[in-house]
Amino acid sequence: MEELQGYLEKDGSRQQHFLYPLLFQEYIYALAHNHGLNGSIFYEPVEVFGYDNKSSLVLVKRLITRIYQQNFLISLVNDSNQNRFVGYNHNNFFFSHFHSQMISESFAIIVEIPFSLRLVSYFEEKEIPKYHNLRSIHSIFTFLEDKLSHLNYVSDILIPHPIHMEILVQILQCWIQDVPFLHLLRFFLHEYHNLNSLLITQKKSIYVFSKENKRLFRFLYNSYVFEWEFLFVFIRKQSSYLRLTSSGTFLGRTHFYEKIEHLQIKHFVVVCRNYFHRTLWFCKDPFMHYVRYQGKAILASKGTHLLMKKWKYHFFNFWQYYFHVWTQPYRIHINQLSNYSFYFLGYLSSLLLNFSAVRNQMLENSFLIDTITKKFDTXVPVIFLIGSLAKAKFCTVSGHPISEPIWTDLSDSDILDRFGRICRNLSHYHSGSSKKQGLYRIKYILRLSCARTLARKHKSTVRTFLRRLGSGLLEEFFTEEEQVLSLIFPKTTPFILHGSHRERIWYLDIIRINDLVNHS
């Protein structure tokens, strides 16, 4: 790790031109081994069949030795094909799977270097304090609280995918100037495309860049989304500028952007220049806000429904002409905020209208004034959460708690710890809900499922098990969230979690959405 840190501290321009040699460094594969195969807080662990960690480290050294050989990648793909069609061999399968997994994970770590350096330098240049808080998912809801109450319409956008793999490589060309590294990426993507088109006839057959190689594909997808968001901001700024200038001046500005090669505006301007001055003049809206997480985005505006429809069809043309992606109209829904609840980041969000009457006294005359205030409201999607719990075998589809038979081989402390961790994570994530009744129901399901699992392990009933050990066994870890909140708020504050249903708390340390919450 120290060697990688020393490399990162070098000149940024050199790193962009010399990323390829990192593929031959042992510490890169060791880092990929720790993050990819042993699991981390961001990625699920991948099982290495029949080998422990020490054996895996030995295989890492063997991989580095083999990668120096000529035509190693081609032979790796051929081995994968032979395992699929000629006959299954456990050893050949393992080495092929392990090597492809390690190379892809290491490739993902290396390709993230220029972006991570640019991100850190940006925050240091802007002197943004506590910029880590901006990574929190809950920070999005604080933004929505401030902005959505003043807007009229919202568009739910499902970003189209996939796009052509060659476009992904072209997107990275403006950030990475290492030509051999880009050629290697192109080789991997084309091999993945060819192998992915074949039928899988064996249960354990895993090929290069299968779905287990999530880190690289997430990076490529984020690069694609960043590209279209960058151009969307460009269009947005031009639409605001258009009414202040003539079409001729605007075309002059597009020629200026056409000269900026590293921003990849050239092709975009050539395609869109013909209709920019005809379409963007009616897209001006100074009150427009955009929020995205993963493949879903929200575009809110204070404009009219006609304006939102124009933006909708503009997005379709933009995706089609620039990214060569044909998308369907159902991927963008336009709704009025006053009577619409949208699902985003594990919450059901809506605008609550509060009607009130104010008596106004002027001299001897008095009259009533009806006022309407809007408030951003978030609630727990109970039905979605019950569906996730049912899929994870904690309850039935109707919400009836059941035992988890797979966990009965664990110790009692491990079972309690697993259920308690799930419950605390859900309570922590949904602390911003204005109504806690639904969250109490979810906690009740997990609590009773834990009791049924323990009773099944000891071949007893839930009532007998709780009578013998006491109900405090389950109370001990389920109330940890409430104990923490009682320390934050003084006793004089009328905040009691079980009594109040309107208090909301947003945390700035949540950087990953829980799998039970993510229904997309």
Curated annotation (Swiss-Prot):
Any one GO cellular component localisation term in the record: chloroplast
Keywords in alphabetical order: Chloroplast, mRNA processing, Plastid, RNA-binding, tRNA processing
Subcellular location as annotated: Plastid, Chloroplast
InterPro entries the record matches: Domain_X, Maturase_MatK, Maturase_MatK_N
Record bears the keyword RNA-binding: yes
GO BP terms, alphabetized: mRNA processing; RNA splicing; tRNA processing
Cystine crosslinks: none
One annotated GO molecular function: RNA binding
Pfam hit, one: Intron_maturas2
Family to which the UniProt record says this protein belongs: Belongs to the intron maturase 2 family. MatK subfamily.
Function per UniProt: Usually encoded in the trnK tRNA gene intron. Probably assists in splicing its own and other chloroplast group II introns.
Protein name per UniProt: Maturase K
Encoding gene per record: matK
